[in-house]
């Protein structure tokens, strides 16, 4: 999923959720 104020530029292999970066709420590899 993409997180941060700029989802298009800040993508993470995790589900987005309010919290500390990378705002992972469900590990999805990498």
UniProtKB/Swiss-Prot annotation:
Function per UniProt: Alpha-conotoxins act on postsynaptic membranes, they bind to the nicotinic acetylcholine receptors (nAChR) and thus inhibit them. This toxin binds with high affinity to both fetal (alpha-1-beta-1-epsilon-delta (CHRNA1-CHRNB1-CHRND-CHRNE) subunits) and adult (alpha-1/beta-1/gamma/delta subunits) mammalian muscle nicotinic acetylcholine receptors (nAChR).
Lineage: Eukaryota, Metazoa, Spiralia, Lophotrochozoa, Mollusca
Transmembrane residue ranges: none
Molecular function in Gene Ontology: acetylcholine receptor inhibitor activity; ion channel regulator activity; toxin activity
Full protein name: Alpha-conotoxin EIVA
Taxonomic source organism: Conus ermineus
Disulphide linkage map: 2-16, 3-11, 14-24
Coiled coil: none
Pfam families attached to this UniProt entry: Toxin_14
Entry keywords, A to Z: Acetylcholine receptor inhibiting toxin, Amidation, Disulfide bond, Hydroxylation, Ion channel impairing toxin, Neurotoxin, Postsynaptic neurotoxin, Secreted, Toxin
Cell inner membrane in keyword set: no
Main localisation: secreted
Modified residues (Glycine amide): 30
Annotated domain remarks: The cysteine framework is IV (CC-C-C-C-C).
InterPro entries with a match to the protein in the record: Toxin_14 (IPR012498)
Family: Belongs to the conotoxin A superfamily.
Tissue: Expressed by the venom duct.
Domain of life of the source: Eukaryota
GO cellular component: extracellular region; host cell postsynaptic membrane
PTM-bearing positions, type 4-hydroxyproline: 7, 13, 21-22, 27
């Amino acid at each position: 999923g993409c997180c941060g104020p700029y989802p298009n530029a800040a993508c993470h292999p995790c589900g987005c959720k309010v919290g500390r970066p990378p705002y992972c709420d469900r590990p999805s590899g990498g």
